[in-house]
From Swiss-Prot:
Belongs to the HisA/HisF family. Signal peptide: none annotated. This is 1-(5-phosphoribosyl)-5-[(5-phosphoribosylamino)methylideneamino] imidazole-4-carboxamide isomerase. Pathway: Amino-acid biosynthesis; L-histidine biosynthesis; L-histidine from 5-phospho-alpha-D-ribose 1-diphosphate: step 4/9. The lineage of its organism: Bacteria, Pseudomonadati, Pseudomonadota, Gammaproteobacteria, Moraxellales. It comes from Acinetobacter baylyi (strain ATCC 33305 / BD413 / ADP1). The active site is at D8 (proton acceptor), D130 (proton donor). It catalyses: 1-(5-phospho-beta-D-ribosyl)-5-[(5-phospho-beta-D-ribosylamino)methylideneamino]imidazole-4-carboxamide = 5-[(5-phospho-1-deoxy-D-ribulos-1-ylimino)methylamino]-1-(5-phospho-beta-D-ribosyl)imidazole-4-carboxamide. The keyword Phosphoprotein does not apply. Keywords: Amino-acid biosynthesis, Cytoplasm, Histidine biosynthesis, Isomerase. GO terms for molecular function: 1-(5-phosphoribosyl)-5-[(5-phosphoribosylamino)methylideneamino]imidazole-4-carboxamide isomerase activity. Its EC number is 5.3.1.16.
Length: 243
């Protein structure tokens, strides 16, 4: 299991939002490439990038920044989400050295697109499911749908999706702890590996997720930026065989 640092990009800077509200941001760095290097130095084995402007615009805004990070970290698996609505965009990111592309809103609106992407880019597609009270949210979390997160995950079980990033919106950026039950439930219901996101605040949260069936990793943002969680300590804990 991996601890995956999040680098959320807004207006060229690294920020953290509270519950996905663009106006409620905290800027942590104005140099995303240096931030990526910092987390690599701290022992990161994968990076989670989000183009926040892209998520709201419906098209990538931070391509040059993402490319620069991928170029600087050629050996490191990188996953990118935010504004990915076309096969051309996916191809562009993969050609630039990104390992995984996360399809979010488009997966809800057009499930066939995900199936098509999985065929064309086998092994590189992650579905991002953002949910509030178990219901899927889209368009940068601005719109809560009547689609159940578990149903959406199940829909892609046989499509060739490599994993699911599951974000509990109510907990994201709020430092309230991770929703272990819903995350494990999603993994078991869909049969797909799940990366937990939203609310990973300290080592206790990491312990709660460790060893749970179907959990591939946990994304953490505000906690590692504000220092309530050490990336190095968390990964060390996960690498130990004991719970």
């Amino acid at each position: 299991m991996l601890i995956i640092p999040a680098i959320d990009l807004k207006d060229g800077k690294c920020v953290r939002l509270k519950q996905g509200r663009m106006e409620d941001d905290t800027v942590f760095s104005d140099d995303p490439v240096a931030t990526a290097q910092h987390w690599v130095n701290e022992g990161a084995r994968r990076l989670h990038l989000v183009d926040l402007n892209g998520a709201f615009a419906g098209t990538p805004i931070h391509k040059p920044v993402v490319e620069a990070i991928a170029k600087a970290q050629p050996e490191l698996p990188i996953q990118i989400g935010g504004g990915i609505r076309s096969l051309e965009t996916i191809e562009h990111y993969l050609d630039a050295g990104v390992s995984f592309v996360i399809i979010g809103t488009k997966a809800v609106q057009d499930p066939e697109f995900v199936e098509q992407a999985c065929k064309q880019f086998a092994g590189h597609i992650i579905v991002g499911i953002d949910a509030k009270d178990g219901m899927v949210a889209t368009d940068g979390w601005a719109n809560v749908t009547d689609v159940k997160a578990t149903d959406l995950a199940k829909r892609f079980a046989d499509a060739g999706v490599s994993s699911i990033v599951y974000t509990d919106i109510a907990r994201d950026g709020m430092m309230q702890g991770v929703n272990v039950e819903q995350t494990v439930n999603l993994a078991q219901y869909s049969g797909l590996p799940v990366i937990a996101s939203g609310g990973v605040t300290n080592l206790d949260d990491v312990r709660l997720l460790k060893g749970k069936p179907g959990i591939l990793g946990a994304i953490t943002g505000r906690a590692i930026y504000e220092g309530t969680l050490s990336l190095r300590e968390a990964q060390l804990l996960l690498d130990q065989n004991t719970l």
